[in-house]
Amino acid sequence: REYGSGGHDVGERVAEKLGIVLYDKDDLAEKLKSLGDYEEVKSFYEERPANSLLYVIAREEDRKMNEKPFEQIKSITENQSCVIIGRCANVIFRNEEEHISVFVHADLEKRIKRIAGTNRISEKEAELLIRETDKRRDEFHNQYTGENWGDSRGYQLSVDSGMIGIEQTVQLICDYMEAKKWWRDCGRQGI
């Protein structure tokens, strides 16, 4: 989700509407801390990409290291319906038939107004914060997946929450889930 698009709020409301668990980076990190598995994957939960020079030199080792947090997320969430905010979940669960991946985005001006209002900062500060956060998320996603963050081909659904609002975004996601369930239950008959 783009920073300031309301993606976290959307995820919370979808989880609430469906009566399922929500996991964001803090929830997952807390779960791992309680299991004693946090320290070795700390940078994953802090959204810190590796140093770019080290990244190039140790790419193969990074791939092995990257598998660990993915395996942990699968283990934490297995056998339950849940909403996962971020954490490259679109890639982690890509081959799971039951998963739905959504990218929530919005026009920069709307995101600036939202962040300035919620954080009580100037619009100039909000824009800087948005650009820094989006850049960090892009680098993080690219490092851990090798894919471009926000590329619609990496998600089943990409929604502009700035155009339709948070509540309609939630409803659109729930409607999509119902349509996907219908399609699966009908045996995927061609149109």
Residue ranges of predicted features:
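Glycine-rich phosphate-binding P-loop
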Residues: 1-14
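Short, polar loop motifs at secondary-structure junctions
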Residues: 86-90
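Short, amphipathic alpha-helical "lid/cap" segments that border enzyme active or binding sites
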Residues: 70, 166-174
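Conserved phosphate-donor/acceptor-positioning beta-strand/loop module used by diverse small-molecule
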Residues: 95-118, 123-133
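C-terminal helical "lid" subdomain and adjoining coupling/linker elements of P-loop NTPases
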Residues: 180-191
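ATP-dependent small-molecule kinase phosphotransfer cores
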Residues: 27-81
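Small-molecule kinase domains that catalyze NTP-dependent phosphoryl transfer to phosphate-bearing small molecules
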Residues: 47-51, 122-167
